[in-house]
């Protein structure tokens, strides 16, 4: 009989707490429903960034770094050094859909995604001559690949072909380095997303 008062006290506390828990459950259920409707910010947030501009030629390394990877360039006496890699995630949407008329115009070095981006427009407008030289280089590259018979043209033609061969090899090296940079940026983006997902699951 010593346990009887204790059992009654426990039953009283249990029945007293039941309405409170029911009320708390009713108060929490709308919050749970509202949380279920709206996704959490961690799940929906992704570090995506659209291209700043679209280059006329992917062989223009400085333009590709500026438009696609948003890298700052430092002019040194020996060469141009890129640094400050921005967000690796980028949109693959072509700017031809946004500017169909301007995309066909290859006189500019690049086409900006936003007309309000004055820095981008000045960069693309200032690079008109570089873009023209790049187009000329591409045409020469195609002609070099097709081959030219220098047997009748003499030593100047042979010398020109040797110089063009060196330039072509250099441009191929630049193109390969750009492809490697894009591949590394893509791998970094995938690694970042995987780390973000695992971090959200653990917490």
From Swiss-Prot:
Which residues make up the pro-peptide?
Answer: 26-50, 83-203
Q: Map out region (Endothelin-like) in residue numbers.
A: 110-124
Assigned GO CC terms? extracellular space
Signal peptide from the UniProt entry: 1-25
The molecular function terms in GO held by this entry are:
endothelin A receptor binding; endothelin B receptor binding; hormone activity
- What Gene Ontology terms for biological process does this UniProt record contain? endothelin receptor signaling pathway; intracellular calcium ion homeostasis; positive regulation of protein localization to nucleus; positive regulation of smooth muscle contraction; regulation of systemic arterial blood pressure by endothelin; regulation of vasoconstriction; vein smooth muscle contraction
Site (Cleavage) location in chain: 73-74
Residue span of region Disordered: 27-48
Location in the cell: Secreted
Q: Which residues are glycosylated?
A: 200
Q: Which InterPro entries match?
A: Endothelin, Endothelin_toxin_CS, Endothln-like_toxin
What the record says about family reads: Belongs to the endothelin/sarafotoxin family.
Q: What does this protein do?
A: Endothelins are endothelium-derived vasoconstrictor peptides. Probable ligand for G-protein coupled receptors EDNRA and EDNRB which activates PTK2B, BCAR1, BCAR3 and, GTPases RAP1 and RHOA cascade in glomerular mesangial cells. Also binds the DEAR/FBXW7-AS1 receptor. Promotes mesenteric arterial wall remodeling via activation of ROCK signaling and subsequent colocalization of NFATC3 with F-actin filaments. NFATC3 then translocates to the nucleus where it subsequently promotes the transcription of the smooth muscle hypertrophy and differentiation marker ACTA2.
PANTHER family the record matches: ENDOTHELIN, ENDOTHELIN-1
**Can you say what this protein is called?**
Endothelin-1
Tell me what organism the protein belongs to: Sus scrofa (Pig)
**Encoding gene per record:** EDN1
